[in-house]
Design a protein with these regions (language model features):
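Short, small-residue-biased leader/transition segments that mark boundaries at the very start
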Residues: 1-5, 403
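Beta-strand-rich modules
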Residues: 48-67
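Extracellular fibronectin type III
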Residues: 65-84
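Long, ordered, amphipathic alpha-helical scaffolds
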Residues: 85-97, 113-115, 120, 128-133, ...
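Acidic Gly/Asp/Thr-rich repetitive segments characteristic of extracellular carbohydrate-active
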Residues: 91-156
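Extracellular beta-strand-rich solenoid/capping regions of secreted or surface-exposed proteins
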Residues: 132-152, 168-192, 201-218, 223-237, ...
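Extracellular beta-strand/beta-solenoid scaffold signature
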Residues: 172-181, 203-207, 224-233, 253-267, ...
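Right-handed parallel beta-helix
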Residues: 189-199, 213-224, 236-252, 262-263, ...
Length: 403
């Protein structure tokens, strides 16, 4: 396909792209939506979404100025499945999945509506909710809230390009920006918000999620958000945040909010959450896991890159949390912190120049009196098979040695 671009782009008025399973006949080609084909400075790009794991072939047709067409097919392309693991996919959870508008094999659910959100269409995109056509990114989500369980049909919002605060029809959360809210606790939403390609982003706002079940965020960046990047605030379940780039937010009013508040915060009886394959860029307070919660809730963090973020990786109250295969890289304050009877299983992580890799309030490292953490009652950390390089302090129970 790249040869077609190089030879024909000067004479082409546009491109059409198709995809099929590699073993299928040519009449099985399915046309990609036009929005999935984009022109860049010196190349065109087409993305095929909603494919299950397997081998595929794409065909690109150039439409020339004289009306003729030239087509070329790719060699076999391998599609890998996402890593659907962690508490969002627990068999004991309410919905047993966090795949949103998708099936767990990576294909769109049968009755899913696809809504393309671009800088040009964020105010004008449409979807049918509870039998009525609704216009605008936030307005569609507001209608979904009003419908409650009357309309649980899946919605797949696909972000193309960089959508800024000025592009959006309105915000239902003055603190965060876009609000995704169910009508009552743990409402089945079946919503995916995903980016297309390598440059999808939102800038100047974040997301507030409340009363929602089965919601997925994936494959886009969140930049210069208002307060929190993604706030899972009240009575959510089966939420999956993955393959994201989260930068820091706007400066807040408190002394510890120079980089905004939380990047991904989880609180208010939100449970069965997985945060995975996320690149946290220089965050100040990365992930709060519990605020005024009094009952146990379940969260998994795996395969994340905490890239020179300062603290809260995560900062845990009450919850039971599995933290594995993460890269803690140059963290100025601390890595995992537990308080208020929380339990963390910290497994197979790599700590590089993380000042205090693991802390339980008023115990061990925190008891040294540096004032780096919390005065709340402590929690429990079980650490296994971690690698630690360049830490200032790491104290294990029943050990006379600390680093």
């Amino acid at each position: 396909a790249s040869d077609v671009y190089k030879r024909q782009v000067k004479n082409a008025e546009g491109y059409v792209a198709y995809v099929k399973e590699a073993s299928a006949s040519d009449d099985a080609y399915e046309k990609l939506d036009d929005t999935l084909i984009r022109q860049y400075a010196d190349y065109w790009r087409a993305d095929a979404l909603g494919l299950k794991e397997g081998s595929y072939v794409m065909k690109v047709t150039a439409v020339l100025k004289d009306g003729k067409t030239v087509s070329e097919s790719t060699s076999s392309l391998e599609v890998e499945k996402y890593d659907r693991s962690g508490f969002a996919f627990s068999e004991n959870s309410k919905f047993q999945t966090g795949s949103g508008a998708y099936n767990d094999d990576g294909t769109l659910k049968k009755d899913a509506q696809v809504i393309y959100v671009t800088p040009e269409t964020a105010k004008t995109c449409t979807a049918v909710v509870n039998g009525k056509e609704v216009t605008g990114f936030q307005s569609i989500l507001d209608a979904k809230q009003s419908a409650g369980t009357k309309d649980t049909s899946p919605l797949d919002f696909r972000i193309v390009g960089c959508v800024t605060a000025d592009d959006v029809d309105h915000f239902s959360s003055s603190a965060e920006g876009i609000q995704l809210k169910g009508k009552s606790a743990y409402t089945e939403m079946n919503i995916t918000i995903e980016g297309v390609g390598e440059d999808a982003a939102v800038q100047g706002f974040g997301f507030l999620v409340r009363n929602s079940g089965n919601v997925e965020f994936r494959n886009f960046a969140v930049m210069a958000f208002m307060d929190d990047g993604i706030s899972l605030d009240t009575k959510n379940c089966n939420i999956w945040v993955h393959n994201m780039d989260i930068f820091y937010g706007s400066t807040g009013g408190d002394s510890d909010q120079a980089k905004g508040d939380g990047s991904v915060d989880i609180k208010g009886a939100s449970t069965n959450v997985t945060v995975s394959y996320v690149h946290f860029w220089d965050s100040g307070k990365c992930s709060l896991c519990g605020m005024s919660d009094s009952a146990e809730f379940l969260v998994t963090y795996h395969h994340n890159w905490f890239d020179h973020s300062d603290s809260r990786h995560p900062r845990i109250r009450v919850a039971s949390v599995h933290i594995y295969n993460n890269y803690f890289d140059g963290n100025a304050k601390y890595g995992v912190g537990t308080t208020k009877g929380s339990s963390a299983f910290v497994e197979a992580n790599y700590y590089r120049n993380c000042k205090n890799p693991m802390m339980s309030s008023m115990q061990g490292t925190d008891a040294l009196g540096q004032g780096t953490f919390s005065g709340e009652n402590g929690g429990m950390i079980k650490a296994y098979n971690n690698i630690t390089v360049g830490a200032s302090s790491l104290i294990y129970a029943l050990s006379l040695i600390h680093i």
